Swiss-Prot record:
Monomer or homodimer. Exists as a homodimer in the apo state and as a monomer in the CPC-bound state. The monomer protects cells against apoptosis more efficiently than the dimer. Only the dimeric form is capable of enhancing tubulin stability in cells. When phosphorylated, interacts with LAMTOR5/HBXIP; the resulting complex binds pro-CASP9, as well as active CASP9, but much less efficiently. GO terms for cellular component: centriole; chromosome passenger complex; chromosome, centromeric region; cytoplasm; cytoplasmic microtubule; cytosol; interphase microtubule organizing center; kinetochore. The modification N6-acetyllysine is found at residues 23, 90, 110, 112, 115, 129. PANTHER family: BACULOVIRAL IAP REPEAT-CONTAINING PROTEIN 5, DETERIN. InterPro entries: Baculoviral_IAP (IPR051190), BIR_rpt (IPR001370). It holds the Pfam family BIR. The gene is BIRC5. The BIR repeat is necessary and sufficient for LAMTOR5 binding. The keyword DNA-binding does not apply. Zn(2+) binds at residues 57, 60, 77, 84. This is Baculoviral IAP repeat-containing protein 5. It is found in: Cytoplasm; Nucleus; Chromosome; Chromosome, Centromere. It comes from Canis lupus familiaris. One of its GO terms (biological process) is establishment of chromosome localization. Multitasking protein that has dual roles in promoting cell proliferation and preventing apoptosis. Component of a chromosome passage protein complex (CPC) which is essential for chromosome alignment and segregation during mitosis and cytokinesis. Acts as an important regulator of the localization of this complex; directs CPC movement to different locations from the inner centromere during prometaphase to midbody during cytokinesis and participates in the organization of the center spindle by associating with polymerized microtubules.
Length: 142
């Protein structure tokens, strides 16, 4: 079974697939945070206009930017997301049993749901703040 036949989220378990996301990555040879080392630490490159070096762990969804050439991706990952289960996996994706993989992917799915829920809550709170402000302005105008 080829990597392309895997669901997109599962393709990210393959280091080569993660490496392929590092197009226009500013740190190449002579740096600690090369695309290969970033992918080894679980990161994918997801740049934005304002954050060209934004990288996100595909597993815990922690986003880090402001990379320096000497930053060690695994150490930075541990420092900012020490509970990421991906960091404790000692086998390659292809070596995991089905049971091990499904248990691991269940953790990734829980992380994704938590991240999305947190984002929606922030969005709701921002909207509620704007609505409250508009209501207060209406009340003050009376």
């Amino acid at each position: 079974m080829g990597a392309s036949s895997l669901p997109p989220a599962w393709q990210l378990y393959l280091k080569d697939h993660r490496v392929s996301t590092f197009k226009n990555w500013p740190f190449l040879e002579g740096c600690a945070c090369t695309p290969d080392r970033m992918a080894e630490a679980g990161f994918i490159h997801c740049p934005t206009e304002n954050e060209p070096d934004l990288a996100q762990c595909f597993f815990c969804f922690k986003e880090l930017e402001g990379w320096e050439p000497d930053d060690d991706p695994i150490e930075e990952h541990k420092k900012h997301s020490s509970g990421c289960a991906f960091l404790s996996v000692k086998k390659q994706f292809e070596e995991l049993t089905l049971s091990e993989f499904l248990k691991l992917d269940k953790e990734r799915a829980k992380n994704k749901i938590a991240k999305e829920t947190n984002n929606k809550q922030k969005e709701f709170e921002e909207t509620a703040k704007k609505v409250r402000c508009a209501i207060e302005q209406l009340a003050a105008a009376e």
